From Swiss-Prot:
GO terms for molecular function: antiporter activity; proton transmembrane transporter activity. GO terms for cellular component: chloroplast inner membrane. GO terms for biological process: potassium ion transport. This is Potassium/proton antiporter CemA. Keywords: Antiport, Chloroplast, Hydrogen ion transport, Ion transport, Membrane, Plastid, Plastid inner membrane, Potassium, Potassium transport, Transmembrane, Transmembrane helix, Transport. It is found in: Plastid, Chloroplast inner membrane. PANTHER family: CHLOROPLAST ENVELOPE MEMBRANE PROTEIN, CHLOROPLAST ENVELOPE MEMBRANE PROTEIN-RELATED. It is a multi-pass membrane protein. It holds the Pfam family CemA. The gene is cemA. Contributes to K(+)/H(+) antiport activity by supporting proton efflux to control proton extrusion and homeostasis in chloroplasts in a light-dependent manner to modulate photosynthesis. Prevents excessive induction of non-photochemical quenching (NPQ) under continuous-light conditions. Indirectly promotes efficient inorganic carbon uptake into chloroplasts. The keyword Lipid biosynthesis does not apply. It comes from the Eukaryota. Residues 284-307 are annotated as: Disordered.
Amino acid sequence: MLMKAHDSKFYRWLFSTPYRALHRAYEASKKVRNIQRDYLFYKNAVGDSSKRSFYNVTLYIDSILNQSASNIFWSLLEFKISINLCNFIVSLRDPHIDNEKSDFIFESFNKSTKENLENLVDLQKDKNLLSNERKNVISLNSYTRSFKQKIGNYINLLIGWKPKNEVNYLTENLSFTSSIEENCFFLKKFYNKTLDWERWNRKLTWIEAVLIDLELLKNKGWFSSEALSEQRNPQPFPNFNTSYKTVSLSGPFVERSKKMQKIGSRSKLNQNFSPYIDPGAGTYGSTTKEGSSGANSRKGNPFGRSVRGTEKVKDTAYESLGLVPRSITRTLSRFQTELAGRSASLVLPEFRLAKYQAITSIKYLAFLIFCPWLVLTVCKILFLEPLIENWWNTAQFQIFLSFSQEEKALKRLQQVEELLWLDIIMADSSAKQPQDLSAQIHQRTIDLVETYNQESIQTILHFFTNFLFIFVVISLLIWGKKRLAILNSWVQEVFYSLSDTMKAFFILLFTDLCIGFHSPHGWEILIGFILEHLGFSHNKHVISCFVSTFPVILDTVFKYWIFRHLNRISPSIVVSYHTMNE
């Protein structure tokens, strides 16, 4: 009985998979509609006076649209696969049923299923009759049949077909479930969902409209005049029977059930659904006269900005500076919003924007750190190190790359000889000591040669890995230009959200580290390490020239930034900085 109950649960789950997949795709399509509706509500509430991170809002919408499109794709793929699987299972019903009889079964699905439900309810009420009939039926443990016949009998029970011995057939197929109540519930659920083809077609039509919208926005963009003209003048849908290339409803599970109910006319569906997203529509999801007037009032621009031809929106991560400081315009905009009583409607969009901005920035920063390191490690272990080591040991006869390496090796060899002679002098004299000394010096020389040979290989390897690192980082910065803009905007937002005292503290900390009194010693150590890492000799003149010029240039740039930018954005920070510096 336990296996029978599991079989019943499996069939329930299998035949409800198309409904679950279609429902997920439908919910994802509604999310696409809702995200644009919320953004339009946010733009209408804020108005044109606010310039709140327009570029980041666009990126947020793109991310949500891409995620929803992916969910729709995989849900429709699951829907199609499950439909085909159900078609295959339906084709495995009792082999004694010919095609004409099976067509008759599907055409009379409504009537036979209701009768089957009534019979099950009658059997449930009359438990004595059911128990008596079960005594006349051979138990499942002693009755063997093929897997195809088991599934076929179960499907025949679902679709309402019954052989002549109706009571024995129902009783025998009830052994696939744990109780009659479960069969009644499942048959009702299967009956209600399968007959509702009108709802299926409406959901598929809605999903088709959303996919057309996403394709339009992806190919033509939000701000192109062609896309906006098509949004203002939507074209009717293509024929429903030929429009679905991604999801094709066919097979005995679908085609025969479609004979019971006719698909609604296209005029009715076109009245319920808008073929394109109309951002300026008054009633979202439908093309009404008020929506057309609303779109015309804003000239069809979903963001409330002027569009001239195919003019592109300037990619800026934050608002540019103008004659009026940005803080004043933001304060006036928020004050106007508070007076209009629209502040509550701005909390959720701003929270979503801040959350998206922070998560995207942290992910991109971690990606910039770990991705180059991972690429360099893999390339170094698998390709670069074996190739360079083989080339250096076979094609090159020299050991040292620079004169500084030879000097270091010579000094090291002299130190080894001096230590060995010191050991001989302090030890007892013997005749074999000169021979032992020569052998020890020879062995130490071989060790030094191997050490500096490996050091030369590592220097060449570092040279190539540094170029590879620079190439990977530049590629990531170019590829993630939008995310870099979000990271830049997020860092500025975090910095400007601090108090004036904390801002001045971090500015002082940075300046003292880079151009402070003790900074030249740090620069000397840093430049010397970089030169040694790249394989160059330690040149004091080059290091002194760099230390005497670069901090001065950096100090000049920093003072200009304070005078030109920070003094206009927040004068209080400059006052706090000078006070703490003094």
